[in-house]
Protein backbone atom coordinates (compact mmCIF):
# COMPACT_ATOMS: atom_id res chain seq x y z
CA UNK A 1 0.00 0.00 0.00
CA UNK A 2 1.25 3.48 -0.80
CA UNK A 3 2.56 5.47 2.15
CA UNK A 4 1.15 8.74 3.44
CA UNK A 5 3.45 11.63 2.59
CA UNK A 6 3.34 15.42 2.68
CA UNK A 7 3.50 15.76 -1.11
CA UNK A 8 1.84 12.50 -2.05
CA UNK A 9 -0.94 11.51 0.37
CA UNK A 10 -1.39 8.14 -1.35
CA UNK A 11 -4.08 5.64 -0.50
CA UNK A 12 -3.96 6.41 3.22
CA UNK A 13 -4.44 10.13 2.58
CA UNK A 14 -7.38 9.45 0.26
CA UNK A 15 -8.99 7.14 2.81
CA UNK A 16 -8.67 9.77 5.53
CA UNK A 17 -9.77 12.72 3.39
CA UNK A 18 -12.75 11.28 1.53
CA UNK A 19 -15.76 11.24 3.83
CA UNK A 20 -17.71 8.74 1.72
CA UNK A 21 -14.87 6.19 1.79
CA UNK A 22 -14.59 3.53 4.50
CA UNK A 23 -11.35 1.86 5.53
CA UNK A 24 -10.30 -1.32 7.31
CA UNK A 25 -7.50 -1.28 9.86
CA UNK A 26 -5.36 -4.17 11.11
CA UNK A 27 -5.21 -3.19 14.79
CA UNK A 28 -2.15 -5.04 16.04
CA UNK A 29 0.40 -2.27 16.58
CA UNK A 30 2.62 -3.71 13.82
CA UNK A 31 0.65 -2.96 10.67
CA UNK A 32 -0.70 0.33 12.02
CA UNK A 33 0.77 2.23 14.98
CA UNK A 34 -1.48 3.28 17.87
CA UNK A 35 -0.96 6.98 17.09
CA UNK A 36 -1.89 6.42 13.45
CA UNK A 37 -5.08 4.62 14.48
CA UNK A 38 -6.00 7.56 16.73
CA UNK A 39 -5.40 10.01 13.86
CA UNK A 40 -7.55 7.88 11.54
CA UNK A 41 -10.40 7.74 14.08
CA UNK A 42 -10.29 11.52 14.49
CA UNK A 43 -10.26 12.05 10.72
CA UNK A 44 -13.07 9.58 10.01
CA UNK A 45 -15.79 10.69 12.42
CA UNK A 46 -18.71 8.96 10.68
CA UNK A 47 -19.61 5.78 12.61
CA UNK A 48 -18.59 2.77 10.55
CA UNK A 49 -16.09 4.56 8.36
CA UNK A 50 -13.24 2.70 10.10
CA UNK A 51 -13.64 -1.01 10.79
CA UNK A 52 -11.39 -3.84 11.94
CA UNK A 53 -9.91 -6.48 9.65
CA UNK A 54 -7.50 -9.25 10.62
CA UNK A 55 -5.35 -10.13 7.57
CA UNK A 56 -4.65 -13.24 9.59
CA UNK A 57 -3.14 -16.43 8.24
CA UNK A 58 -4.69 -19.85 8.81
CA UNK A 59 -2.06 -20.48 11.49
CA UNK A 60 -3.62 -17.95 13.87
CA UNK A 61 -4.54 -19.73 17.07
CA UNK A 62 -2.13 -22.62 16.48
CA UNK A 63 1.26 -23.41 18.04
CA UNK A 64 3.20 -23.28 14.76
CA UNK A 65 6.40 -21.22 14.97
CA UNK A 66 6.96 -21.14 11.21
CA UNK A 67 5.40 -22.32 7.97
CA UNK A 68 5.94 -22.10 4.24
CA UNK A 69 3.78 -20.02 1.93
CA UNK A 70 4.38 -19.79 -1.82
CA UNK A 71 7.90 -21.13 -1.36
CA UNK A 72 8.80 -18.60 1.33
CA UNK A 73 9.40 -19.37 4.98
CA UNK A 74 7.20 -17.32 7.32
CA UNK A 75 8.23 -16.94 10.96
CA UNK A 76 5.89 -16.32 13.86
CA UNK A 77 7.05 -14.46 16.95
CA UNK A 78 5.41 -12.10 19.45
CA UNK A 79 2.24 -11.62 17.42
CA UNK A 80 4.08 -10.94 14.16
CA UNK A 81 4.49 -12.95 10.99
CA UNK A 82 7.68 -12.07 9.13
CA UNK A 83 9.90 -13.22 6.32
CA UNK A 84 13.44 -14.31 7.20
CA UNK A 85 14.68 -10.73 6.64
CA UNK A 86 12.14 -9.32 9.13
CA UNK A 87 9.69 -7.93 6.56
CA UNK A 88 6.11 -8.11 7.82
CA UNK A 89 4.38 -11.04 6.11
CA UNK A 90 0.87 -10.94 7.55
CA UNK A 91 -1.05 -10.69 10.77
CA UNK A 92 -1.14 -13.20 13.58
CA UNK A 93 -4.28 -12.07 15.32
CA UNK A 94 -7.98 -12.76 15.44
CA UNK A 95 -10.60 -10.03 15.69
CA UNK A 96 -11.08 -10.57 19.44
CA UNK A 97 -7.40 -9.65 19.84
CA UNK A 98 -8.00 -6.56 17.68
CA UNK A 99 -10.93 -5.57 19.89
CA UNK A 100 -8.72 -5.90 22.99
CA UNK A 101 -6.01 -3.84 21.29
CA UNK A 102 -8.47 -1.08 20.42
CA UNK A 103 -9.77 -0.94 24.00
CA UNK A 104 -6.51 -1.33 25.93
CA UNK A 105 -3.96 0.32 23.62
CA UNK A 106 -5.95 2.81 21.56
CA UNK A 107 -8.32 3.65 24.41
CA UNK A 108 -11.69 3.52 22.69
CA UNK A 109 -14.83 2.33 24.52
CA UNK A 110 -15.50 -1.42 24.47
CA UNK A 111 -18.82 -1.03 22.62
CA UNK A 112 -17.16 1.01 19.85
CA UNK A 113 -14.44 -1.61 19.39
CA UNK A 114 -17.09 -4.35 19.18
CA UNK A 115 -18.98 -2.40 16.53
CA UNK A 116 -15.76 -1.99 14.55
CA UNK A 117 -15.43 -5.81 14.45
CA UNK A 118 -19.11 -6.66 13.85
CA UNK A 119 -21.79 -4.35 12.49
CA UNK A 120 -19.47 -1.85 10.75
CA UNK A 121 -17.80 -4.42 8.45
CA UNK A 122 -21.12 -6.16 7.79
CA UNK A 123 -22.63 -2.83 6.70
CA UNK A 124 -19.61 -2.18 4.50
CA UNK A 125 -20.27 -5.38 2.52
CA UNK A 126 -24.05 -4.90 2.55
CA UNK A 127 -24.82 -7.84 4.84
CA UNK A 128 -25.94 -5.98 7.98
CA UNK A 129 -29.20 -7.94 8.15
CA UNK A 130 -27.37 -11.30 8.07
CA UNK A 131 -24.05 -11.01 9.89
CA UNK A 132 -22.66 -8.85 12.67
CA UNK A 133 -26.08 -8.60 14.34
CA UNK A 134 -28.37 -10.67 16.53
CA UNK A 135 -31.73 -10.27 14.81
CA UNK A 136 -34.52 -12.64 13.74
CA UNK A 137 -33.48 -14.22 10.45
CA UNK A 138 -29.78 -13.39 10.89
CA UNK A 139 -27.15 -16.16 10.98
CA UNK A 140 -26.67 -16.09 14.76
CA UNK A 141 -22.88 -16.11 14.66
CA UNK A 142 -21.67 -14.72 17.97
CA UNK A 143 -19.23 -15.17 20.80
CA UNK A 144 -19.07 -14.78 24.51
CA UNK A 145 -16.21 -12.57 25.69
CA UNK A 146 -15.22 -12.50 29.34
CA UNK A 147 -14.42 -9.31 31.27
CA UNK A 148 -10.86 -9.38 29.87
CA UNK A 149 -12.25 -9.65 26.32
CA UNK A 150 -11.04 -13.23 25.89
CA UNK A 151 -13.19 -15.61 23.85
CA UNK A 152 -15.03 -18.03 26.15
CA UNK A 153 -17.50 -19.57 23.72
CA UNK A 154 -18.33 -19.41 19.99
CA UNK A 155 -21.61 -20.00 18.16
CA UNK A 156 -21.99 -20.31 14.40
CA UNK A 157 -25.49 -20.30 12.91
CA UNK A 158 -26.78 -20.69 16.46
CA UNK A 159 -24.74 -23.85 17.15
CA UNK A 160 -22.13 -23.84 19.92
CA UNK A 161 -18.66 -24.70 18.59
CA UNK A 162 -16.46 -24.26 21.67
Model feature map: region roles:
Residues 123, 133-162:
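C-terminal cap of metal-dependent C-N hydrolases
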Residues 117-118, 138:
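A general structural motif at alpha-helix termini
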Residues 1-112, 117, 123-128, 145-150:
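Active-site-adjacent C-terminal substructures of enzyme catalytic domains
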Amino acid sequence: MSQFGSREPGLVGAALELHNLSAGIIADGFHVDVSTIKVALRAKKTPGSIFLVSDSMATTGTNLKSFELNGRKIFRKNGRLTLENGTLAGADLDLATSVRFMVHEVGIPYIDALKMATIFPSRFIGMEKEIGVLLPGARADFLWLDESLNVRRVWRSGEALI
